[in-house]
Amino acid sequence: MSLTVWNIESIKDVAEMLGIGNLADEPAAAIAMDLEYRIHQVVQEATKFMVHSKRTVLTSADISSALRTLNVEPLYGFNNSRPLEFHEAAVGAGQNSLYYLDDEEVDFEKIINAPLPKVPRNISYSAHWLAIEGVQPAIPQNPTPSDHTVGEWASKGTSGVMPGASTAAKEARNGVTSMDNVEIKPLVRHVLSKELQLYFERITSALLDETNVELRDAALSSLRDDPGLHQLLPYFIMFLSDSVTRNLGNLVVLTTLMHMAWALLDNPNLFVEPYVQQLMPSILTCLVAKRLGSDPNNHEHYALRDLAAFLLGIVCDRFGNVYYTLKPRVTRTALKAFLDNTKPYSTHYGAIKGLKTMGKEAIRVLVVPNIKVYEVLVRKTLEKGNEEEIYEANKCMDALYDALLLLRDDQLPNQRTLPPNASGLLEKNVGSLMAEKIMKENDTSLLLGLLE
């Protein structure tokens, strides 16, 4: 007598379907017991998938996953999209009822003639800043502050009221929620300690103090070396930008601010990369501004422009690979200022220094072809200008010559010889004034570099 829930007759029916006739009762009973064990095993594994999926209903997907776990080919044609429908088949009188699964009939001709489905898109990944220095940037990928606030209140709802809550919280505890009495405060980007606030005030006041040089140097040294200033970095960048705009007539303060930018860039503990876009306008202002300082006859602004050009080179070399449009934009700004005849020579000087920091190819491609045209403006100033204008024009010519030194030929002068008409070719390339200056210096390496 079989102790399984499976009828021996069912086993014999399946055997006959497979072409096995006259199956004895003993092997049929053994197969029935093994079948019961296998089904229990599959259901047990499928239940694990159901529990891990946090569901209370067993689905055909769980059965398929269990079969794959047991290294058995899963059943095909069964899915969770529609429920299984069993129909009773007509059998003879006195026989047990027979039920079968009502499968949907599929027309092969219709499937063959149907259009192919669309090809799915390729898998792609995109990166964005989740947070920068503890601040979530306002980009489409990140939730807005309003969404965050609404989601926070929706999640609280009627559950969990903080101790010491107001009347609105008591109403929420009783199941009544009202948003009318809720005051939504703006998000605070940074919460600075009193020590950091005091440090910021002392540093900024020391940098703007023109009388105490020692205190100013100590402040710059602190900005260059202290490791715990990352929270203050955005405030220092904002202070730098505002102070440059307000102190264009004070060379001492502007020079100090450029040294401040240098100190922030030199500090190995600060991550300046996210603030390059806010830092560049201040540096470019000190580089190509029409007038720096209150006295037009004070030539110390040239040293400030040299310092700004030096900082410009540091920023472009360090962050040019991250911001791939940084160098082209800076080059375009400097070239536009250099070629604008309405700009003063002080702006031209800063533009030439800025183009020099862009490297050898920028000088060869952008500066050299325009020297001969620029000479027309310089020659007119040398002939009809006053003493101050002549001085500024000569400073620009000196800056151009200094930029051309980047084009020196690396080979030794005795390894190559100059063409017989070197002077004429040089004058044709860079104009008579610059050619005369170069020939006077007798720099053979520079001559070879310009005549390539």
Swiss-Prot record:
GO CC annotation: cytosol; nucleus; SAGA complex; transcription factor TFIID complex
Any one Pfam family match given in the protein's UniProt record, by short name: TAF
Keyword Cell cycle: no
UniProt entry keywords in alphabetical sequence: Nucleus, Transcription, Transcription regulation
UniProt superkingdom: Eukaryota
GO terms for MF: protein heterodimerization activity; RNA polymerase II general transcription initiation factor activity; transcription coactivator activity
Gene ablation phenotype (knockout): Cells lacking taf6 are not viable.
Domain Histone-fold, residue spans: 4-68
InterPro entries: ARM-type_fold, Histone-fold, TAF6, TAF6_C, TAF6_C_sf, TAF_TATA-bd_Histone-like_dom
GO BP, one annotated term: transcription initiation at RNA polymerase II promoter
Cell location: Nucleus
Gene3D superfamilies in UniProt: Histone, subunit A, TAF6, C-terminal HEAT repeat domain
Entry's free-text remark on domains: The histone-fold domain (HFD) is required for interaction with taf9. The C-terminal HEAT domain is required for bulk transcriptional elongation.
Function field: Functions as a component of both the DNA-binding general transcription initiation factor complex TFIID and the transcription coactivator SAGA complex. Binding of TFIID to a promoter (with or without TATA element) is the initial step in pre-initiation complex (PIC) formation.
Record's subunit section: Component of the 1.8 MDa SAGA (Spt-Ada-Gcn5 acetyltransferase) complex, which is composed of 19 subunits tra1, spt7, taf5, ngg1/ada3, sgf73, spt20, spt8, taf12, taf6, hfi1/ada1, ubp8, gcn5, ada2, spt3, sgf29, taf10, taf9, sgf11 and sus1.
Family of the protein in this entry: Belongs to the TAF6 family.
Protein name according to UniProt: SAGA complex/transcription factor TFIID complex subunit Taf6
Organism: Schizosaccharomyces pombe (strain 972 / ATCC 24843) (Fission yeast)
